Amino acid sequence: GSSPVGTYEHLVEMYENGDLDFSQVTTVNLDEYKGLAGSDEQSYRYFMNTHLFHKININHANTYVPNGTEPDAEKACQAYNELLHKIGPADIQILGLGHDGHIGFNEPSDHFENETHCVDLTETTIQANKRFFDSEKDVPKQAYTMGIGTIMRCRKILVVVSGKDKAEILKQVIQGPVTPEVPGSILQFHPDCTIIADEAALSEMAV
């Protein structure tokens, strides 16, 4: 989503100032819409290229995003799982938080999915993301997403949350019970998770 855009802007600025070198960095993205090619302006590959990869000295061959053009969901997910196991746990994972508590495209469910899988997007997610498309009917109904188990194996997690509209769900994620109905709540069990939020997003918190 758009939550980390400000983070990417700072990373680009630090690179331009000579403070960061991305030549040895490998990135793995959380998710991609099923059916969208990397050249599609609404794809997450295009988003990452535009906001980060094409502005820094990263080796493009070391930037990985699920293959949205693979119509066979099982094949697409297996390929990404094999890649993730080969690379190993990420040193740092940057997450946003959906209005319904989803992380990546791990939507509210009756169970946590461990590995990369194909998910049917909820109406809440479709409504939240339609602003990026010409019309609501253009929003893909499915996506490939990294699983909760893979996310939890990352060594450090940063969650970026902003806005009053995220206040109630952020409260549930931090102070509510751990449940797959609020996927982000699983982060309570991560040994090194930091949440970066503005005052509006924290306005429902009891401290």
Tell where the protein language model's regions lie, with residue ranges:
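Short beta-strand segments
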Residues: 1, 29, 66-67, 94-97, ...
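A glycine- and small-aliphatic-rich helix-loop capping segment at beta-alpha/alpha-beta transitions
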Residues: 9-20, 44-46, 108-118, 178
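Class I SAM-dependent methyltransferase SAM-binding "motif I" and its flanking Rossmann-like core
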Residues: 100, 104-148
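ATP/nucleoside-binding phosphotransfer catalytic cores, i.e., glycine-rich phosphate-binding loops
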Residues: 149, 153-207
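Short, flexible loop segments at the rims of nucleotide/cofactor-binding pockets, characterized by
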Residues: 69-72, 134-140, 173-175
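A glycine-rich beta-strand to alpha-helix segment
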Residues: 2-7, 82-108
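Solvent-exposed alpha-helices and their adjacent loops that cap or buttress functional pockets
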Residues: 19-21, 57, 84-88, 112, ...
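Ligand-binding beta-strand-loop-alpha-helix segment within the catalytic cores
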Residues: 19-92
